[in-house]
Amino acid sequence: MTEAESKTVVPESVLKKRKREEEWALAKKQELEAAKKQNAEKRKLIFNRAKQYSKEYQEKERELIQLKREAKLKGGFYVDPEAKLLFIIRIRGINAIDPKTKKILQLLRLRQIFNGVFLKVNKATINMLRRVEPYVTYGYPNLKSVKELIYKRGFGKLNHQRTALTDNSIVDQGLGKHGIICVEDLIHEIMTVGPHFKEANNFLWPFQLKAPLGGMKKKRNHYVEGGDAGNRENFINELVRRMN
């Protein structure tokens, strides 16, 4: 028997299979390396954005302090610019509620007592709030409230499912196409009522708050009358602390 005949002949089908497996392994390796690189770049981008937002918030706070100081020196007082963002909490149930009011509460996504949602201030939302005012309380949330609500009680809507915001990938999946890829992006979009506020707000599931520590005073009375309903302006932040 010659040397050539003694060598094992590998079938062509086996060679093709081996080649396919090697190509698949190489492609998988390249895919993993690309994903690793992409994740590293995304983490860097998220870090830089968070840093940028923090700087932006601090500058805004310093500017506000300076404006108040200047107004005081001139013998006047500083008037806050008109708010763009509201936080609304439903404080009453369904007893003796008329169909139109019930419908508006549903449109506002306030289906249960102690549900809370963000709203952009405009003529339409103000008109709706006036209609349901005996059943809700609302005001102007500050950065601390927005952050604490989203980080502590935030759930997103993914495939019509209520999904906890456990990491940035949840936000990226839901809002990445709008350039909102992390929780800090989401907070910034809500707080500044940005160009994609509607999408960001619809992504957020209504907040389910707890009954306030110390309870409610008089749900049927307006806030300015010593009750709980209606506009409490900046004092909504104190209520958020008690219910979060």
UniProtKB/Swiss-Prot annotation:
Keywords: Ribonucleoprotein, Ribosomal protein. One of its GO terms (molecular function) is structural constituent of ribosome. GO terms for biological process: maturation of LSU-rRNA from tricistronic rRNA transcript (SSU-rRNA, 5.8S rRNA, LSU-rRNA). InterPro entries: Ribo_uL30_ferredoxin-like_sf, Ribosomal_uL30, Ribosomal_uL30_CS, Ribosomal_uL30_euk, Ribosomal_uL30_euk_arc, Ribosomal_uL30_ferredoxin-like, Ribosomal_uL30_N_euk. This is Large ribosomal subunit protein uL30w. The keyword Hydrolase does not apply. SUPFAM superfamilies: Ribosomal protein L30p/L7e. One of its GO terms (cellular component) is cytosol. Pfam families: Ribosomal_L30, Ribosomal_L30_N. The keyword Lipid metabolism does not apply. Belongs to the universal ribosomal protein uL30 family.
